[in-house]
Amino acid sequence: MTSGNNINQPVTYPIFTVRWLAVHTLGVPTVFFLGAIAAMQFIHR
């Protein structure tokens, strides 16, 4: 039980990383604005 402590804490990348935060803080508004602009193309006054 001395070196078996590392099994529950893998060295692989976790889900919530700084890269995940950066991708989603940039990507979610980008997709939202792209969808809004694309929807505005079909609105004719």
From Swiss-Prot:
Pfam families: Cytochrom_B559 (PF00283). It is a single-pass membrane protein. With its partner (PsbE) binds heme. PSII binds additional chlorophylls, carotenoids and specific lipids. The chain crosses the membrane at residues 20-36. The keyword Magnesium does not apply. It is found in: Cellular thylakoid membrane. The keyword Cytoplasm does not apply. Coiled coil: none annotated. Its cofactor is heme b. GO terms for molecular function: electron transfer activity; heme binding; iron ion binding. GO terms for cellular component: photosystem II reaction center; plasma membrane-derived thylakoid membrane. InterPro entries: PSII_cyt_b559_bsu, PSII_cyt_b559_CS, PSII_cyt_b559_N. One of its GO terms (biological process) is photosynthetic electron transport chain. Heme binds at residue 24. Keywords: Electron transport, Heme, Iron, Membrane, Metal-binding, Photosynthesis, Photosystem II, Thylakoid, Transmembrane, Transmembrane helix, Transport. Belongs to the PsbE/PsbF family. Heterodimer of an alpha subunit and a beta subunit. PSII is composed of 1 copy each of membrane proteins PsbA, PsbB, PsbC, PsbD, PsbE, PsbF, PsbH, PsbI, PsbJ, PsbK, PsbL, PsbM, PsbT, PsbX, PsbY, PsbZ, Psb30/Ycf12, peripheral proteins PsbO, CyanoQ (PsbQ), PsbU, PsbV and a large number of cofactors. It forms dimeric complexes. HAMAP family: PSII_PsbF (MF_00643). This is Cytochrome b559 subunit beta. The gene is psbF.
